[in-house]
Amino acid sequence: MPFGCLTLGEKKDYNSPSEVTDKYDLGQVVKSEEFCEIFRAKDRNTLKMYTCKKFNKKDGRKVRKAAKNEIMILKMVKHHNILQLVDAFETKKEYFIFLELATGREVFDWILDQGYYSERDTSNVMRQVLEAVAYLHSLKIVHRNLKNLVYFNRLKHSKIVISDFQLAKLENGLIKDPCGTPEYLAPEVIGRQRYGRPVDCWAIGVIMYILLSGNPPFYDDGDEEDSDSRDKNLFLKILSGDYEFDSPYWDDISDSAKTLVASLMEVDQDQRLTAQEAIAHEWISGNAASDKNIKDGVCAQIEKNFAKAKWKKAVRVTTLMKRLRASEQGDTGASGLAAGATGGPPDPNMPGGSLLAASIKTALSEKAADAQTSTIPSLPQPPAARPEEQQQAQQQQQAQQQQQARCNGDVPQMLPQRKGY
């Protein structure tokens, strides 16, 4: 049965579980991810191996939505640097997605095994990623969770493929829900602005930064046990574009590479380089990438930074922001007063909480005031308040927000089109 749309009132025609098992032999679970379990599957007729993703409907609405979304997107795309959809089934209890099997290693692991690694190797990787993303963007598809790059097989000149389209979305001017992996998030996602295809270009800039230095562009040096403070500081650094090409890690990297990274990691999404523009950059399409061996320095930093990191795990950023809000309210008990610290009420749609909202505004105002330097803004500390004052302030703020919503009609604005998209 083709996995397609049903007409209004038509009875749902599910696949039977035997349709799946009669065609494919599912092996043991290879790994479990946020939304699904991953299997190696063998076609019983051709004996060809595939990757199978199984989504259990009982795991909730988000899982069901992720499965349907990935199927919809994968049915739209066909590109040699994108892992292709082979088959899809929906039973009463599960979704099954069968994909091409990528047997190669992740790019980070590949680098660690090389005897020689240079900017030209990175340029080759980034060119393939940019071509895939430019193709997606031509279809108005936003991936929203670019990070895991793998080689399709273990041959010497294997291609790079991207996958994991559970969070991908068609750009219609209304994307605002935050999701993805925190360290790869663009400023507009954290700031709860409406966003679109430029978020993928930011993530590509983060990936390129890591591949050239072995370090993440944004990190917090604070107490690793205080996860809320660490995440908050990470978000503030991303919002203000607070990263450096620090020595000695960037000493041997060409100016052309640094220029491309900076253009992809431009805080203003309207000024950020598009995927197609990045492909035309001299470091990608020309001969600007250096062939100097940078393997030792990059590998040392990759092993140091990513052995204990959580970067490979996608999280719902909404959940993270809510946790920060709960922590802040527990510390200050003054969510209604933080508005006074910034001259106005925080965005009612922003789940990051009062202090995070104030910090965002502080970070952005400092960035605008001093475009030449990137500093970590100090967090405003609202004064302590009595419980009755807190309750009164919260009630007043809620009433103002409700009145504003009635006056405005909550009509969303369309995302302005950028040249090149």
Curated annotation (Swiss-Prot):
Domain of life of the source: Eukaryota
Ranges of Low complexity composition bias in the record: 330-340, 390-406
Primary site of residence: membrane
Membrane disposition: Peripheral membrane protein
Keyword Membrane: yes
UniProt keyword DNA repair present: no
Subcellular location(s) of the protein: Cytoplasmic vesicle membrane
Tissue specificity: Ubiquitously expressed.
Every Protein kinase domain range: 24-284
MF GO annotations: ATP binding; calmodulin binding; protein kinase activity
Positions of the UniProt region annotated as Disordered: 326-421
SUPFAM superfamilies according to UniProt: Protein kinase-like (PK-like)
Keywords: Calmodulin-binding, Cytoplasmic vesicle, Membrane
Cofactor: Ca(2+)
GO cellular component: cytoplasmic vesicle membrane
Matching Pfam families: Pkinase
Subunit relationships: Interacts with calmodulin, in the presence of calcium.
Domain topic, free-text comment: The protein kinase domain is predicted to be catalytically inactive.
Role: Does not appear to have detectable kinase activity.
Family designation: Belongs to the protein kinase superfamily. CAMK Ser/Thr protein kinase family.
Annotated protein name in UniProt: CaM kinase-like vesicle-associated protein
Native species: Takifugu rubripes
Gene giving rise to this polypeptide: camkv
